[in-house]
């Protein structure tokens, strides 16, 4: 598990977020922003590692998945499709937030068709990310 990096702090106990982002700088920024909401964060660098990591954990281990869409090895949409089909109690219901620079309506539509729960376009603000996460965990679906 050489590309799995855990960033943990005692900011709260909202659970663990799986961050899937191939750019290390973007991952560090997102990690700080997610931790501010009280989550622990585990980071993997591509969709294939996300599928592997999600599949090897117990149901309910992750409270949230933050998924970049454009990544090498396996993109975020394929990873989301596979996660949604895993034989795990939480595979169909864990919130998955897509983060992408592709802001066309067809990109958003494709994300939702592939099982994404919420969609954020890059560049995004910390406020946007926090609002989407808070709305998702409170009501189910959010988009900005």
PLM feature spans:
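C-terminal compact regulatory domains
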Residues: 1-144
């Amino acid at each position: 598990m050489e590309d799995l990096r855990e960033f943990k702090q005692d900011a709260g106990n909202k659970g663990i977020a799986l961050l899937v982002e191939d750019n290390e700088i973007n991952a560090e920024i997102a990690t700080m922003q997610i931790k501010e909401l009280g989550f622990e964060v585990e980071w993997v660098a591509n969709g294939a590692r996300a599928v592997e990591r999600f599949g090897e954990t117990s149901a309910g281990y992750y409270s949230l998945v933050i998924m970049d869409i454009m990544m090498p090895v396996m993109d975020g949409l394929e990873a989301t499709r596979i996660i949604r089909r895993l034989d795990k109690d939480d595979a169909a219901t864990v919130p998955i937030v897509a983060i992408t620079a592709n802001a066309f309506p067809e990109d958003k539509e494709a994300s939702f068709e592939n099982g994404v729960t919420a969609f954020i376009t890059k560049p995004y603000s910390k406020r946007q990310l926090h609002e989407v996460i808070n709305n998702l965990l409170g009501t189910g679906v959010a988009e900005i």
